[in-house]
């Protein structure tokens, strides 16, 4: 690989994007396909056949031998089935290469083999994948060769969504319709579409692959279940934005190139706070494309790490005692002609459309804080949220001094007359230029922060799909916009009505705004006084999916049916219980086969040392005896805690699948796991390093 990368030539070279379609498709076909992409017009089979043929020819030129409907079931990862382009051999023994419009538009994977939460029985196997033409197809190269990947939605035989993409597309249509109504009220007759724009900042850890293989907890669960803190962690703040090590730099270079080939706008890369932790952030894209790109990015991060002798960890909390990993979801609403509805301008107090959009979103987040919290619910996130590293589990909105002041003016006097300006920053060094500061600071502790012209939702877990949180954001915004438009369209005096509505929403939903320190213990108490929900675990958050409030919301905008919501809740409970069960069994396996034998071996060496030294000379052996007693005591505690965990784990199956089993796992199994970890981590600090059966935290996070 050469040192020089021609990014302009590389970018999108493996994507069947607009420029490729313009070049290869007949004009009529291209225009019809664009109408489908931009306006949702139905695509005829005649047009689909032409598109499929040209897509196949292009893919073959790129080295593809197979095609795949690439979709995102409710497993948390992508799925695909590869079919070759070849047809049955002809009489002369040769084959043709074929790909029809029908094969492009529809596939039939086995729906019974994916999570359905009761929507599909094992014998009800038929499911369909359907081409999402708004997200471009791409060719992916790996050891198997080239594969044409076609982004698709996945639904059951009876039409229920079994994936992440379908509800996301539905929610995008909902917010588009209602946002267009809103901007029409302000005289905008030219914009034809409003699209949620999303940029997902992806955090991850890199560790040496050989050391990863020696940690069964990492290989089975994605996180360390045991591990004592090394003498140094992240307390010196020297890793964040520090110099990137050569091995990691080479890795990042290849990650960027792989992303750029697939049209992923990988933009920013840097070291994160914890040792061995890093971040990759792209430029914004439409929400469905951003979700696809993030799934592709996670795969690239893992694949390239393996090539460089490393392992990429996407778990939210792979190491206790240092920061975990999240995925900040930056969300805004943009028209097809480039207007950002969340752009306040220089004088936000005069920007009435912006203030209406802003207060609608405050209303949406306040009304559906439980749903927004649930959209980030994940078993790994339970170990991350609420620490001094990630947002608290209470949803609140940070607006900053400028916007908070504007709203306070509206609430207290009924009129906003001014907006705070940013002052000039003077460094006191003549050779450094002075410049205007932003009107407000940032707040890294807020779960939902306004950051200039977008909202940044910081709760999402690092390995999770961003689809779910954007489904919620789009749908709750659509509801708030609809309710506002219903009132304003019927108002005799629009100017007066919109002013009153902004004031009403700002007043009624002021409790959701919090500009202080979200890490402070006092905030949890204040949030309780305000009546804000504090859903501290995944199990607490899941019921938000099936409340009558949620059902009414999602059914009104045709995003989910009641049955689909119930199925997703059941899947979430099942995922939680299975994940905890796997972690518990892994702890028991490691303790039985590695920890206890290693400690017995070490205490035997200590005992032999005591006897040998005593036999050789009349000297003090109190150090050896003290160490022997401590290790033996901790070994006994370890065995006792292991037995308690084994008992708790054995009873998991006694509880019905669903909420009861998940609650039991959280209340009993997780507690037993914590109690087993404590003596084992203490033992690690006492036992000879050469006898400890696995790499330490220091080995893992400081040796990449």
Give the positions of each predicted feature:
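Composition- and surface-driven signal marking solvent-exposed, interaction-prone regions
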Residues: 218-219, 294, 316-317, 343-347, ...
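C-terminal amphipathic alpha-helical interaction region
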Residues: 507-704
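Basic/polar N-terminal segments that are highly enriched at the extreme N-terminus
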Residues: 1-9, 703-704
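Hydrophobic/aromatic-rich, well-ordered segments within soluble, folded domains that form packed cores
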Residues: 64, 68-70, 293-307, 333, ...
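Glycine-rich, acidic/polar active-site loops that bind/position phosphate-bearing ligands
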Residues: 125-314, 323-329, 333-570
């Amino acid at each position: 690989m050469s040192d020089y990368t021609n990014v302009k030539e590389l970018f999108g070279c493996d994507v069947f994007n607009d420029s490729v379609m313009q070049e290869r498709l007949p004009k009529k076909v291209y225009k019809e396909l664009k109408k489908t992409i931009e306006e949702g017009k139905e695509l005829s089979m005649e047009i689909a056949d032409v598109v499929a043929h040209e897509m196949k020819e292009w893919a073959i030129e790129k080295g593809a031998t197979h095609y795949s409907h690439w979709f995102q079931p409710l497993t948390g990862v992508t799925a695909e089935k590869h079919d070759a382009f070849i047809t049955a051999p002809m009489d002369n023994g040769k084959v043709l290469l074929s790909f029809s419009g029908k094969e492009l538009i529809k596939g039939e994977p086995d729906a019974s083999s994916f999570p359905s939460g009761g929507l599909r029985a094992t014998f009800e196997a038929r499911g369909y994948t359907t081409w999402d033409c708004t997200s471009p197809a791409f060719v992916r190269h790996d050891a198997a060769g080239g594969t044409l990947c076609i982004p698709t939605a996945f639904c059951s035989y009876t039409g229920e969504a079994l994936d992440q993409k379908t509800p996301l597309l539905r929610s995008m249509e909902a917010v588009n319709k209602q946002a267009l109504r809103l901007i029409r009220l302000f005289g905008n007759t030219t914009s034809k579409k409003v699209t949620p724009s999303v940029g997902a900042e992806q955090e991850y850890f890199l560790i040496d692959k050989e050391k990863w293989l020696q940690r069964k907890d990492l290989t089975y669960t994605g996180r360390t279940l045991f591990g004592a803190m090394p003498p140094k962690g992240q307390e010196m703040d020297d890793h964040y934005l520090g110099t990137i090590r050569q091995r990691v730099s080479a890795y990042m270079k290849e990650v960027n190139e792989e992303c750029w080939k697939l049209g992923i706008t990988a933009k920013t890369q840097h070291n994160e706070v914890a040792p061995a932790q890093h971040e990759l952030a792209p430029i914004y894209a439409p929400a469905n494309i951003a979700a696809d790109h993030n799934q592709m990015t996670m795969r690239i991060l893992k694949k390239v790490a393996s090539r460089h002798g490393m392992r990429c960890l996407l778990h939210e909390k792979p190491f206790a005692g240092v920061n975990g990993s999240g995925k900040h979801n930056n969300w805004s609403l943009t028209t097809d002609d480039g207007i950002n509805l969340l752009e306040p301008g220089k004088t936000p107090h005069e920007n009435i459309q912006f203030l209406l959009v802003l207060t609608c979103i405050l209303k949406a987040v306040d009304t559906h804080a439980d749903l927004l919290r649930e959209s980030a619910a994940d078993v790994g996130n339970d170990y991350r949220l609420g620490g001094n590293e990630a947002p608290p589990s209470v949803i609140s909105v940070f607006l900053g001094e400028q916007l908070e002041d504007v709203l306070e003016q509206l609430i207290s006097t009924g009129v906003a007359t001014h907006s705070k300006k940013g002052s000039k920053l003077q460094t006191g060094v003549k050779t450094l230029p002075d410049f205007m500061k932003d009107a407000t600071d940032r707040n890294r502790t807020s779960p939902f922060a306004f950051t200039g012209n977008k909202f940044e939702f910081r709760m999402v877990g690092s390995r999770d799909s961003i689809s779910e949180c954007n489904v919620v954001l789009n749908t709750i915004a659509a509801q708030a916009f609809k309710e506002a438009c219903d009132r304003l369209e019927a108002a005799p005096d629009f100017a007066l009505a919109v002013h009153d509505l902004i004031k009403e929403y700002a007043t009624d939903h002021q409790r959701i705004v919090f500009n202080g320190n979200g890490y402070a213990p006092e905030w949890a108490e204040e949030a309780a006084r305000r009546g804000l929900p504090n859903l501290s675990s995944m199990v607490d958050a899941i019921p938000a999916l099936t409340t009558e409030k949620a059902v009414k919301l999602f059914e009104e905008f045709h995003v989910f049916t009641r049955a689909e919501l119930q199925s997703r809740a059941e899947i979430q409970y099942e995922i939680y219980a299975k994940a905890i069960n796997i972690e518990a069994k892994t702890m028991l396996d490691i303790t039985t086969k590695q920890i206890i034998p290693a400690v017995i071996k070490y205490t035997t060496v200590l005992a032999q040392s005591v006897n040998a030294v005593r036999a050789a000379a009349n000297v003090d052996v109190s150090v050896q005896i003290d160490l022997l007693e401590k290790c033996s005591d901790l070994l006994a505690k370890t065995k006792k805690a292991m037995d308690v965990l084994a008992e708790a784990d054995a009873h998991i199956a006694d509880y019905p699948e669903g909420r009861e089993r998940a609650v039991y796992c959280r209340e009993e199994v997780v507690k037993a796991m914590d109690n087993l970890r404590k003596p084992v981590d203490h033992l690690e600090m006492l036992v000879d390093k050469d006898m400890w059966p696995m790499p330490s935290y220091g080995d893992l996070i400081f040796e990449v």
